[in-house]
Amino acid sequence: MGEDFMHPPFQTYPSKNSEGKKHIVIVGGGIIGCCTAYYLTQHPSFSPSTHHITIIESRRIAGGASGKAGGLLASWAFPHQIVPLSFQLHQELSDEYDGENNWDYRRLTTVSLEADVREEVIENYERLSKKAYNLNVPPPKKRPGYISNKFNIGDSNSSLSSSGSSLKNDSASNEEEGSDIHVSSSVPSLHSLTNERMRSHTNSASDLDSVSPVEQLRETNIHNPLPADLDWIRRELVNDWSSLGGTDTTAQLHPYKFTHFILSKAMETGAVDLLLGKVVGLKCDEMDCVHSLKYLPSVVKNRRNSRGHAENPDIKLGTIFNDENAKPIEINDIQQIVLSMGPWTSKILKDCPISGLRAHSVTIKPSEKTVSPYAILAELKVNDREFFSPEMYARKDEVYVCGEGDTLVNIPESSDDVEVVSEKCDELYHYVSKLSPTLSKGHLLRKQACFLPVLNVPTSSGPLIGETNVKDLYIASGHSCWGINNAPATGKLMAEILLDGEATSAEISSLDPKLYFDATILS
């Protein structure tokens, strides 16, 4: 199949393919929307002769968190209602479609570790070992008014971590490869979950408190050494670690590739159209049913020609925008509408309690051709009272690194407009380089940022899956840091709800959107 699936065919105006058929419209071309389309086409009640699906995406497939995520999969993720199903479906999809080659699926080991990367500790080790360590990555520059996302010891409200499942590609296409505001949310952060697991599994070094930091680290490595094949980390700086999962419970994939592949399989049926446009409103009738929407067609400049090259080399390939002065186009032959818009859901449903958490990430080409397959959730001591908490995911040809989230800016109009704070990316690269010579001697490939969809209710971590209190209007959103992990289950369950009238593969009554907001309040 090659990588032809990375460039799906699209249109900007509705086709006539839905005439005389049950027409299901999915708003949002991220991993949730694409998995929903795929599992609809796989449902035994679905037939291209009687059903048609239109995916409406404002900018590009997997242009947000679905393309910018780390891609960590874990059987111990949340929520428990759908995680076992989704983890199993990921394996089944890989087995069926050669996920190892098509979207870099593989099982791996996940660890949590604490390391001391203070300058004095590093200098002491180098002096004692008589081995110099040259850090090739300079400290990040701070712009005026910029404060990093490190948090002080004792803070009980550190910002929600952006996970390996839900994160990052630069603010444009992935085709070309004040103070921090802490988030108060019922959603547990990935770091809080793993720290809890670490406390229950690790060999504590608390009995070493009376000795020097260097001696502590040396003693810890004697009694609790890191796995031998985790050789791209400076193990002498690690003072505690824990296994969070082996190949039986954790895996990874490249989310951008996966999303495009699964969409291509849905479109192969001939029953799925991809429409580029920005949905600007839904229309309810007097019975609180919704069967029509309006959208602004996206304008695409500099498309690829028949040879796959840009038509105009002076314009960025695939530049997309919406003409806000254009007359909206109405689609009114819809039987069911699914909103899988992630943090943009509340742009349409004003009462929906889903907001966005911005997360930065970088990808690094390591100095070694390959690094051993580990996902690492780190807590780095950077000075006497500050920690920094990056996550590192070794891919086949690069290492993905992400940091904690922030709410410093509002959600922009599209995923292309997400502001990337270069200093945050530089900070990520600087601190992980202290821990890894392989990364320090490598080179930075990409700086990027995206928004994660967070459900802001005290009684649920999300997501919301199912029909709203508006008939035939459905939502699949609010997956927080586990959107990549839980996408197949969400897609399968949505297909059951849309075609059978109920979810049968998992019990998800607690994820019912009707419990949390009023969908009749439209934009």
Curated annotation (Swiss-Prot):
<feature type="modified residue" description="Phosphoserine">
    <location>
        <position position="306"/>
    </location>
</feature>
<protein>
    <recommendedName>
        <fullName>Putative oxidoreductase TDA3</fullName>
        <ecNumber>1.-.-.-</ecNumber>
    </recommendedName>
</protein>
<dbReference type="InterPro" id="IPR006076">
    <property type="entry name" value="FAD-dep_OxRdtase"/>
</dbReference>
<feature type="region of interest" description="Disordered">
    <location>
        <begin position="157"/>
        <end position="189"/>
    </location>
</feature>
<comment type="similarity">
    <text>Belongs to the TDA3 family.</text>
</comment>
<feature type="compositionally biased region" description="Low complexity">
    <location>
        <begin position="157"/>
        <end position="172"/>
    </location>
</feature>
<dbReference type="Pfam" id="PF01266">
    <property type="entry name" value="DAO"/>
</dbReference>
<dbReference type="GO" id="GO:0005770">
    <property type="term" value="C:late endosome"/>
</dbReference>
<feature type="modified residue" description="Phosphoserine">
    <location>
        <position position="204"/>
    </location>
</feature>
<comment type="function">
    <text>Putative oxidoreductase that negatively regulates the retrieval of cargo from late endosomes to the Golgi. Regulates YIF1 and KEX2 localization. Required for fast DNA replication.</text>
</comment>
<keyword id="KW-0560">Oxidoreductase</keyword>
<dbReference type="GO" id="GO:0005737">
    <property type="term" value="C:cytoplasm"/>
</dbReference>
<dbReference type="InterPro" id="IPR036188">
    <property type="entry name" value="FAD/NAD-bd_sf"/>
</dbReference>
<keyword id="KW-0963">Cytoplasm</keyword>
<comment type="subunit">
    <text>Interacts with BTN2.</text>
</comment>
<dbReference type="GO" id="GO:0016491">
    <property type="term" value="F:oxidoreductase activity"/>
</dbReference>
<dbReference type="GO" id="GO:0042147">
    <property type="term" value="P:retrograde transport, endosome to Golgi"/>
</dbReference>
<feature type="modified residue" description="Phosphoserine">
    <location>
        <position position="189"/>
    </location>
</feature>
<dbReference type="GO" id="GO:0005829">
    <property type="term" value="C:cytosol"/>
</dbReference>
<keyword id="KW-0967">Endosome</keyword>
<keyword id="KW-0813">Transport</keyword>
<keyword id="KW-0597">Phosphoprotein</keyword>
